[in-house]
């Protein structure tokens, strides 16, 4: 039976979270299969992926220059545009009204830049992400806005379906 290694990434370069670092991880792991966070229905290869997920695309492209790996798209679906704009609106609102949210997001960014993939794949990152989500829920609870609640629930539902 094979080994499955899950590597949490970020879709853009940020300090030590870089395509070169991810490529080094891939070289150490030597995967036979790389699962791509992309719905099979829209998968058109790495060239197209580079527009939405440049970090992963660059690392995988570099890796397969010298190694063989099957690329398998596995995401469930692409969320509709209203979903994306609603989530952006919710996050923008929470950012405007919550210093705690901003501090947590800044901490997340700083840790990614300084510690890279070891942070992204560690327990402390999970704790920070949970604190960010809890702060979003707290702020939305204060607002009592149906459109924001629906947008947040759609976002959480999307995350749950993907997990």
Task: List where the protein language model places each region.
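Extreme N-terminal starter segment of soluble prokaryotic enzymes
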Residues: 1-5
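Short, flexible loop segments at the rims of nucleotide/cofactor-binding pockets, characterized by
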Residues: 10-15, 49-50
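Short, acidic/polar
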Residues: 17-27
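Structured catalytic-domain cores with a bias toward divalent-metal coordination
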Residues: 20, 30-32, 68-70
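Proline-aspartate-enriched helix->loop->beta-strand connector
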Residues: 26, 30-36
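Metabolite-binding pocket within alpha/beta catalytic cores that recognizes anionic/polar moieties
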Residues: 31, 41-48
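Short loop/turn segments at strand-loop or loop-helix junctions that form parts
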Residues: 35-41, 74-79
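Hydrophobic, often amphipathic alpha-helical segments used for membrane interaction and targeting
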Residues: 48-163
């Amino acid at each position: 039976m094979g080994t499955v290694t899950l590597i949490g990434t970020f879709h853009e370069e940020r300090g030590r979270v870089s395509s070169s670092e991810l490529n080094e991880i891939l070289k150490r792991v030597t995967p036979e299969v790389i699962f791509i966070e992309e719905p099979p229905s829209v998968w058109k290869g790495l060239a197209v992926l580079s527009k939405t997920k440049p970090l992963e695309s660059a690392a995988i492209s570099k890796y397969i220059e010298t190694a063989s790996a099957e690329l398998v798209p596995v995401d469930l679906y692409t969320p509709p545009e209203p979903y994306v704009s609603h989530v952006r609106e919710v996050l923008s609102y929470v950012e405007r009204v919550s210093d705690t949210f901003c501090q947590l997001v800044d901490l997340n960014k700083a840790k990614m830049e300084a510690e890279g993939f070891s942070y992204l794949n560690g327990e402390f990152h999970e704790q920070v992400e949970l604190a960010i989500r809890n702060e979003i829920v707290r702020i939305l609870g204060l607002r009592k806005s149906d459109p924001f609640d629906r947008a947040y629930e759609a976002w959480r539902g999307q995350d749950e379906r993907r997990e």
